[in-house]
Amino acid sequence: MERIPCLTTISNILKIINPEELEICLYGIFNNILKQKLKIKDKQICIDGKTVCSTANMKEHEKPMHIVTALLADASVSLGQITVDGKSNEIPAVRELIGLLNIKDSVITLDAMHCQKETVELIISKDGDYVIQLKGNQGTFYKDVYAMFDEKYMDIADKDSNYETYKTIEKGHGRIETRTCYVLKDLEYFTDYLAEWWGLKKIFAVKREVEIDTQKTTEISCYISSKNTSAEKLLMYTRKHWQIESFHWLLDVNLGEDDSKVISKNSQTCLNIIRKFCVSIIKKYIENNSVKRKTIIANMRKCLLNEQFLVDILTYYCHNPL
């Protein structure tokens, strides 16, 4: 190749590339190592959707394009994605993605939108476990669960006999953040729900208190899980689910995904795969090597200006993919 292809050529290529084949090519260099990693028990797979906001005003799209991604926690590696039109199609897309993945001995974490019996049954049928946030879309189930973790009720209840608890306190950037996980020890009150929700073994809540100067905010989130484990582990799963939110944020802030003007759905999907791959390899390199600047955008710019630095990142990731 004598020169870098023009934008039109790149655009035409992206329109005809098979996204699945592209993903295989990008991740194939360490596919065998990845397979070994996926055999480890209790690995966490975070699944969430992200809307490509720039597609909202494009005539070619009936609804804004929405990409559902499965992220291997701690490794920041995308295991797969499904592209749909609009967030309203996210629920069936998540089920389709779960159906494609090998989730045996994995813990699938999902937000409240996916607290659905059919989704839970699919996860259990594939020998996986789930940790899913519970919200008002489940009517009386949510109300009954939330009542057990209401502060007024907990103040008069015997916490030691009714709840298993675990607390973490983090200080930094002028704030103190306290997270407390309360796990119900006795689920006798929820017998009817246990029969309806496959594999349900734990009902718990996470109380998050943030103190900045003299201001304090409190937030309580309720969850259901098929994983029969400790309050410490359950709190860890809820915290690590934040990684996929952070991952999507990086795609916007560092790679400008929400500002992309690409019209083709196929091209947007391919670009999403490439962006996620770039974020994964640079993030991994920054975390494990001594670099002057720790931001992803700064290291991306360095890759453009220093070819050897780009080679160093790719070489490191080939040998240390996870």
What positions do the PLM features span?
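A short, flexible helix-boundary coil/loop motif
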Residues: 251-322
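Active-site- or DNA-interface-adjacent structural scaffold in DNA-acting proteins
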Residues: 1-58
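Polybasic low-complexity intrinsically disordered regions
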Residues: 33-109, 115-128
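Short hydrophobic alpha-helical runs that function as membrane-insertion/retention elements
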Residues: 129-134
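Generic secondary-structure signature for well-ordered alpha-helical cores
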Residues: 19, 99, 150, 154, ...
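An anionic, glycine-rich sequence signature occurring as long contiguous blocks
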Residues: 135-239
